[in-house]
UniProtKB/Swiss-Prot annotation:
It is an enzyme of class 7 (translocase). This is Methionine import ATP-binding protein MetN 2. It comes from the Bacteria. Pfam families: ABC_tran, NIL. Belongs to the ABC transporter superfamily. Methionine importer (TC 3.A.1.24) family. Part of the ABC transporter complex MetNIQ involved in methionine import. Responsible for energy coupling to the transport system. The gene is metN2. Residues 2-242 form the ABC transporter domain. ATP binds at G39, T40, S41, G42, A43, G44, K45, S46. It catalyses: L-methionine(out) + ATP + H2O = L-methionine(in) + ADP + phosphate + H(+); D-methionine(out) + ATP + H2O = D-methionine(in) + ADP + phosphate + H(+). Gene3D superfamilies: 3.30.70.260, P-loop containing nucleotide triphosphate hydrolases.
Length: 338
């Protein structure tokens, strides 16, 4: 559906040294999926996203959307392709002197729709985003979440094939963010729109995306299924993002006073719901002290993570045997101490 091939964006001018915001990125985004791009500020996420609809023209590389080499277009052909790509922003960009209905109608008028078509389409799209009762309201009368819903309505009014989302929840509180993400997922499922969403928060990616690319320093350092990225991150930067999101850090003082073997245990799928630790306690006579733990559900798959301290009153070999048993029964075991 969307192919980025060796895309780079260099903001240097004249004889200035190279200033690469995006450095040789290649991605293949499948039709109908919700694809995330995550990274910290300055990673190049927004710049990369804007190459998809050519709001930012690549310095080098190719951008194809639905088989069309959009990076080579200009003028009317480019405008026609952009009508197939909706976009929402973190700061809404609504027209303050126009009602909700007029804001949505504006994008339809710009696409050349007739008044009759607009009259039919606007109520339909406002119903989809849950704003039927706000049709006559002005942006100043809306909450942040409602403003973003108007932005979404405007972006999908012309039935785009692709919806680009530039940090759509960063200006919203947690509850409102969750509602907006649920709406985006609903739109993806109902309308089949391919969504590309960027965020600096892995929690946003976890909530709504099917696959994700991790960016830092203008490069994609890791890409894959969201569950796999959380379960087995490969790159150090990805591990840092995941660890921060899952909040598994232990106080340094606690680590200093530990006696025994400290494990971080990853449970995937059915193993996340099995009594693995109670089994080893019974079988090997070890004491199991759980210091931290949680089960996350990513999509319909369970990911359990526990930090546990294993001790035995007299036989350290029993602890080693217990660790081996846990390794067989679970996806991954990391010895943190001991």
């Amino acid at each position: 559906m969307i192919q980025l091939e060796g895309v780079s964006v260099d903001f240097s001018q004249g004889k200035q040294p190279s200033n690469l915001a995006v450095d040789n990125v290649s991605l293949h985004i499948q039709r109908g999926e919700v694809y995330g791009i995550v990274g910290t500020s300055g990673a190049g996420k927004s710049t990369l996203l804007r190459t998809i609809n050519l709001l930012q023209r690549p310095t080098s590389g190719r951008v194809l959307v639905n088989g069309v080499l959009i990076s080579e277009l200009a003028g009317q052909p480019l405008r026609e392709q952009r009508q197939k790509i909706g976009m929402i922003f973190q700061h809404f960009n609504l027209m303050q002197t126009r009602t909700v209905t007029e804001n949505v109608a504006f994008s339809l008028k710009a696409a050349g729709k007739s008044n009759a078509e607009i009259t039919l389409r606007v109520p339909e799209i406002l119903s989809l985003v849950g704003l039927s009762d706000k049709a006559s309201s002005y942006p100043a009368q809306l909450s942040g979440g409602q403003k973003q819903r108007v932005g979404i309505a405007r972006a999908i009014a012309n039935d785009p094939e692709v919806l680009l989302c530039d940090e759509p929840t960063s200006a919203l509180d947690l509850e409102t963010s969750a509602a907006i993400l649920a709406l985006l997922k609903e739109i993806n499922e109902k309308l089949g729109i391919t969504i590309v969403l960027i965020s600096h928060e892995m929690s946003v990616i976890k909530a709504v995306c099917d696959r994700v690319a991790v960016m830092t320093g203008g490069r994609v350092v890791e890409e894959g299924d969201v569950f796999d990225i959380f379960a087995t991150p490969q790159h150090a930067f990805t591990r840092q993002l995941v660890s921060h999101t899952l909040d598994l850090a232990l106080p340094p003082r606690l680590l200093e006073d530990l006696q025994g073997t400290l494990l971080k245990i990853l449970f995937v799928g059915e193993s996340a719901e099995q009594p693995v630790l109670s089994d080893v306690a019974t079988r090997f006579g070890v004491s199991v002290n759980i210091l931290h733990g949680k089960i996350e559900y990513i999509g319909n798959r369970a990911l359990g993570i526990l930090v546990a301290l294993l001790t035995h009153p007299s036989d350290p070999e029993k602890v080693a045997e217990a660790v081996e048993h846990i390794q067989v029964r679970t996806a991954n075991v990391e010895v943190l101490h001991g």
